[in-house]
Every structure is written in structure tokens, then in C-alpha cells.
Amino acid sequence: LYVSFIGSDFVEEGRRAGRWLLEQFKDATEPVNIVELQGTTGSAPAIDRKAGFEEVIKENPNLKIIASQTGDFTRAKGKEVMQSFLQAHKDIDVLYAHNDDMGLGAIQAIEAAGLVPGKDIIIITVDAVRDGMQAAADGKINFIVECNPLLGPQLMDAVKAVVEGKEVPKRIVTEEGTFTSEEAKAALPDRKY
């Protein structure tokens, strides 16, 4: 029915977020308390990003998700849920948000609570949209895993291959990167989204 699927690997996005966190806290001997803003309940990105993240962080028993709730991929809900997390937990070390918008909303809540995002609470997000990249460049987001919407070049390569009678993989994973604060600063001027 179809020749190939081109898109993101959401599990791998979660793994990349987890690997970065694992590296940052490799010497941790005390609990590292993580709160998680999940995407829309039941959506593939929310399920898969959570699974990939958890798969990796379980390597360090000090990394603990102490609260996890949907933020519906929106800035407003991310802010609202983060406010609840901050009221319920006084010892949050890390926020993992399944997208930049929820992370940006959470930053508003963190700042309103008198805390410094990116310093008092380490922030990891997924997407790498312009606003998220700017927040990373400003030091408010520590690490972003890209979810690249620019599929055109990979799509055209696959179409040309099919037209030429060549075999193409059933699944082609989008080319995506990761960004620390410094890398976001460098990449921001050339971002297309």
C-alpha cells in the first residue's frame, strides 16, 4: 500500500534527551529529581518520547521522575502544570518537556516562582523551533533534541529513487540534531523554523 515512510523516530528523540541527562549527572550520588511534561495523552510522540527517555535514564538509579503529567503540547498548559509541580515539589532538579512550547510555558512558571530556568532547574525539550532555540541561546533551556519538519530533500531523494526503480527502505528517519545552549546560539541565525 505504501513504498516508504519518512518521519521522526520519537523513541530516539527521548533517548537523546536521556543520554544528555545521563552524561550531565554521571557522577551524581544523590537523587536527581525530574519532572516531565508529556505531550497529548495517547499521541505517538508523547508515548515514544517518554519510553525512550525512561529506557536510558534507568541506567542511573539516582535519576528519578518524581512527577509526570500531560501539558498537551501547549505553552499555556505547560505553564499551568509546571506551577503545580513547583507547588507540590520543592526539590525539582530537572524538567523534561516533550516539546519546546510546554518548556517555554514552564519557564514562565519557574521565573514566576523566583527561580532561574537553566540554572536552578535544568531544562530539556524536544523540537528546536525558533522560540525554543532562542531560549536555549539565552541559557534558559539547557538541551534541545530536534524534531525536524523539513522533510522535502529526503522525500525528493526517495521519490527519485522509486521512479528510477530502486529499492528504498520501508522507513526513512528524518535527519535531526541536538543543541546545547552554545550550539543553539551558533545555529539560530540560520534556522528555517
Region locations from a protein language model:
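Loop/turn elements at helix/coil->beta-strand transitions in domains of secreted/extracellular proteins
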Residues: 1-2, 30-33, 60-65, 90-93, ...
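Second-shell loop/turn segments in exported
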Residues: 1-8, 39-41, 66-69, 91-94
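Hydrophobic alpha-helical
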Residues: 52-53, 66-67, 71-134
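Extracytoplasmic ligand-binding site segments that recognize negatively charged/polar headgroups
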Residues: 9-13, 17, 32-56, 152
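Short beta-strand elements in bilobed, periplasmic/extracellular small-molecule ligand-binding domains
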Residues: 33-36, 54-75, 175
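Structured segments of extracytoplasmic/periplasmic soluble domains
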Residues: 20-28, 56-60, 84-88, 109-113, ...
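Hydrophobic alpha-helical segments within soluble ligand-binding/sensing domains
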Residues: 6-31, 77-79, 128-132, 147-164
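Hinge/cleft segment of the Venus flytrap/periplasmic-binding protein
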Residues: 37-45, 56-57, 147-193
